[in-house]
Amino acid sequence: MIAQIKVLFLLFFISFLSTAQETGSIEGKIISKDGFPLSGVTIKLGKKITSSKTDANGLFHFDNFPIGIHTITIDAEGLKRQSQEIKVVANEITRVSFTLEEEMQTLKEIVIVIKESPNKKKETVLSGLNIKPMDLPQSIQIVSQAVITQQQTIRLSEVVKNVNGVYVGSARGGAQESFWSRGYDMTANNMLKNGFRQNGGSIPEVATLEKVEVLKGSAALLFGNVTPGGILNMVTKTPSFTKGGEINFQAGSYSFYKPTLDFYGPLSKKMAYRFVGTYENSGSFRNNVTRDRVYLNPSFFYKVTPKTDIIIQGDYLKDNWTPDFGTGVIGQIVANVTRATYLGALWSNGQTKQTSLSGLIKHQLNSDWKLSFNSSFQNYDRISIGTERILPLANGDWTRPLGQNKATEQIIGSQINIQGTFTTGKIKHQVFSGIDSENALAQAYTFVFNPANYDIINIFDASKFLTRTDIPTATTTKIVKTTTNRFGVYAQDLLSVTKQFKVLAGIRWSWQEAVADTYNFSPQNSIVKGDAIQNKAFSPKLGLVYQPNPNTSLFSSYSNSFIPNTGVTITNEPLKPSLIDQYEIGIKKDFWKGILSTNLTLYQITNSNLAQTAEFKSDGTINIDTNVKTLNGATTSKGIEIDIQAKPAEGMTIMTGYSYNDMRYTKTTGVTGSFIEGDRLVRTPANTANFSFFYTIPIGKLKGLSLGSMMNYTGERLGGYNNTIGQTIPDRTIPLNGYTTIDVSTGYTWKKWSILCKLSNITNELSYTVHENYSVNPIAPRQILTSLKYKF
């Protein structure tokens, strides 16, 4: 059925295209003398100097251009000035081509520095439409590959420090990092790679990232079942027809070293490749904690026809790591042990394997319309064994429980998208529509040790007890296999009513079905088939944009999303999903031709039908079953975000931001087991802020010398669990103080060589990330990291 719907949907849009009005357009291609397409070349057209740039395939186009005779000019450093007159005819496409005289070796040494406002760069993956952020009634932030390189980031958690309001909520067991935005966890369904869901149970590799996109607020229209805090999308590097590459070696504190190889180039006039590979081996500021990672990322590009491209990418990660549940808590207080103290069994170990393969087909139907098909397969496998859940007594005695975990997931996803532009009267439309589907099989294993506890230690005095060193074995008692199918149809249109007024309207219909089957192996083999739980919902979106001038944009928007629930109603029916409303207003302003860009956003997210334990059963008696729920609770998240980016001088970049968030329970049932009205949700700091500065001296005797600094602030927050009515202990929360980390860096580039040195957390600040109440992990102390790079 899904396949038939896809075909019908595709045929409908192709037939629609045949009636779409075409205006005078220009398409062209620029190649080198060797026949290779050239990207990033500037093309100027007409007396009013309308400009464009060639893409990775050397292609450029101008849409809706006035008819008549016009002059195309190519004028760039290292190239001879070329001009050509062309005639633009109404409703037709005029095609031109240029061949540049320089050889590839000459061209690849040309570096063009562009001062362009981030509000005016066209982004394609998260916004759906190929539109400028200035036209989007929503907050979007991009962390570029240049910033990732300058800051010597080795973890995604370091990248998101550049995005205000996004922070690490926990680092459970040292196996993964959980990111939060606007009071919501982004880990489960909101982590994407190249537009596809990425299992959040691993620590992603950043060496292959071209950029990281963060779309704040609801993205349900494009991605369906996602939480409303925001979407994080990792965009990987792609092949290039320009031959080149680099070798990078990083070394730092605690025996950290990481070589990286990145090389790319043409295989023929129509094919190009890229390969990125890394190996990481490191100790840790935590005693007995190590990590050993291998990552491979091959990709291929094939130019089938001048209008059709195919990109294939592979991805392989093998990560051997030490499970580390941190320092533990005594009551509400983080245990007073040193930052380096490791409390797990010395034989504890874990391994994560993650493999993916994706294919993208893009076809340019004409100058106004393009079609794309994207498909991806992902395999995830994580296993760990050790002692866990550090909950010692007041005197430090801790009976270490044993734990073994294994989780696997296979995900197959597909997307068909069509986007284009047309006009109805004086209104210009930029539409983006499509279908997506996903099938996932997740398997969660349950293991039992006999006995369940390993031994007793004292976290303050290691000599108090005799520590065991043998490695026990566990028995597999159960596997829960959950099959989840998702399907969605969506359409979005940006209407330019006038030059000043724009309207973004869209809607999505999502369907999801999940079935969990339980395979028991103890005390005897049995299979318990689960019931199919279906969720379906419409997710509308409406945004208004007013631009009094090209450098100012005021916007407001409304969007709706849904979150599936577990449990049943008082009549024993599956619980419907919770629907969440989000309102957002803001202003985007550029100063001094884009040298300074500012964004101010205010938002409110309301879940007005939060699932909570029902007060009464259907017969009117008191309910004590926490699986029986009603949709009569509420949470509200509201806040403000400020983002500022500046390029005041050549080679200088400044980024800063501030975020305030207030996420609370605003309505509860008040029955035993329900949350307390007015309480702030755990892991949601009220205040976060970031600042970064980087400057590379462009001329003079000190040319190539670089200086940088970075500051990140995370405010007071609560770890542990939110308190509930009738709980047996006084307080389940863990208060955590706010903290600030400061990094500084310096480097030097000479010809093809560069060296960069970073000192992080220079004040040696101490704080913790807390997952519930049992994984209390200290942040890294002062460390040094040095990178040596050679480009070829």
Each language-model region and where it sits:
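Membrane-embedded beta-barrel scaffold of Gram-negative outer-membrane proteins
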Residues: Q364-N366, K370-S376, R382-G386, S553-L554, ...
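Gram-negative outer-membrane beta-barrel transporters
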Residues: T630-N722, S787-K791
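Acidic/polar loop-and-plug regions of large Gram-negative outer-membrane beta-barrel proteins
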Residues: E280, S284, N297-Q364, F377-E409, ...
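C-terminal beta-signal and adjacent terminal beta-strands/loops
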Residues: S608, N712-I729, G747-F792
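Acidic, small-polar-rich N-terminal luminal/periplasmic segments of exported/outer-membrane proteins
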Residues: F36-S39, K44-I49, D63, E92, ...
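Face-selective signature of the C-terminal outer-membrane beta-barrel domain
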Residues: L357-Y380, P401-D517
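Outer-membrane beta-barrel translocator/receptor signature
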Residues: T208-E210, L221-P298, V304-T308, T355, ...
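Structural signature of Gram-negative outer-membrane beta-barrels, strongest in the C-terminal barrel
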Residues: T305, E409, K428-Q430, D436-A440, ...
